[in-house]
């Protein structure tokens, strides 16, 4: 596992080969979240009532409290994502920085 976040009274963790697990009891036990994602996920965050996970050529987004995640394929790899002041910010290979307000549409930051 590579990343973990807390939001809406639950923990989510992500890892290799699309691994996505959650805990609804403060980490005492974990269950696998059904997902079609097969690419590695490196980080996940909660903000704007949305969970956003990032990884190898992919972004996953949940707007229904983590019940389902939609995969958005990318041409770039994000290694980490955070949320603050209403914006998701992701960083990745080749020193890229992207921002998004919803996790779906990403804008490259020039220059950094």
Predicted region positions:
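Residue-level hotspots at or immediately adjacent to binding/recognition sites across diverse folds
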Residues: 1-112
């Amino acid at each position: 596992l590579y990343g973990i976040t807390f939001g809406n009274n639950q923990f989510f963790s992500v890892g290799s080969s699309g691994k996505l697990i959650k805990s609804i009891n403060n980490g005492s036990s974990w269950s696998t979240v059904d997902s079609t994602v097969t690419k590695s996920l490196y980080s996940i965050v909660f903000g704007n009532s949305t969970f956003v996970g990032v990884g190898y050529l992919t972004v996953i987004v949940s707007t229904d409290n983590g019940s389902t995640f939609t995969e958005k394929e990318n041409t770039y790899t994000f290694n980490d994502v955070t949320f603050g002041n209403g914006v998701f910010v992701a960083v990745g290979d080749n020193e890229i920085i992207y921002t998004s307000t919803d996790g779906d549409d990403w804008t490259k930051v020039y220059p950094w």
